[in-house]
């Protein structure tokens, strides 16, 4: 292992498996959501049955009144290359860190990196921009079956149309008994999705409390849900439509797979489109770039948060339900996209006139007290280290020097209030991702003074 990697031993907590939350990547783990289209096209406020745009996250914040003004980010390890995810083993104190360039590294219970990568996929992947090694989830029965699931960007494979940029690959690997290696030769391809553009790849993986694997998929890239690889849909006011299509491809959606029930997978019987028109893998749709997802470890564990990166004006987090349509590209957040007005539901002949659901968390790129550039998701805090955070959704934004937020249901209205939390005791250039250990404590990943860094969230001094 490169000697420039710094080890921090006092901060590490062992724990159970975790979903990953994170950011928008490039070859160094950085990229904004501008898409380079330069249009600046935003959605006018107050149209299409959404929010009127008056809630900028500064309303009375009764559920957030005990949230601390600042949180410390304590360095666990640095000197990494674009860390975009962290996953905790359920059977040991080991944690696995994903580098977007293609390596999975392991931290032992003291916070020290193992000398060799657990898995090195730098050779077979396509990296750069928003591509690369993007997601990892350990099977709920990892302690006994040793199955790890990885998603990455690969050169175009058989079945990917000419002119497409790459192929999304979901694959399984078998871990050694001691968890220090994922056997390269054990790779089994679970799913391949042709990706027309280089961006909007989403990237996360997470097992739900039902034992099924949840897989967010971006809308196919470019800007505005348009360009090569995008299909026509029911909405004629804006071109493109992968986010609103559920029949032609799997783009712009959240998938739900039973990886134990078939070869390579089966469809859960209660997926919303089973027996209906559309691809059975779909669980929810209407997403642009759902970069990171997380389940709340509290209660029954079924609350599912999806952080969806916006186009030019709004960032959003959705509390997702089966069969939910989250609006893209009819709407960006709770606002009409590129039109003065827009419908609040699909036509009756499109899945019975389903509603376009508002996000629970939304903030603008400019013009509000709470602003950002690309939401990177987060977790509901269930730890004990930080007073006042219990039950609060803690998340971040890719803005320069990073932004840390807290949100929870407020008094009235469907959009939750947001509080900005100051970052104490760390030099942060960008935040890429969040993770959570089995004790409910949270971790941030990003770039700092010494390169790619994993921090543990703790109380400010």
Protein language model features and the residues they cover:
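Acidic, Gly/Ser/Thr-rich repeat motifs that build Ca2+-stabilized beta-propeller blades
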Residues: 53-222, 295, 303-309, 368-411, ...
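Short, conserved, GDST-rich strand-edge loop motifs in beta-rich repeat architectures
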Residues: 154-163, 216-247, 314-315
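Blade-edge beta-strand/turn elements of extracellular beta-propeller
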Residues: 62-78, 112-128, 173-196, 232-292, ...
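Repeat-solenoid scaffold signature
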Residues: 279-316
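Ser/Thr/Gly/Pro-rich low-complexity, disordered linker/stalk segments of secreted
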Residues: 30-59
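N-terminal Sec signal peptide cleavage junction
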Residues: 22-26
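N-terminal secretory signal peptides and thylakoid transit peptides that target proteins
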Residues: 1-18
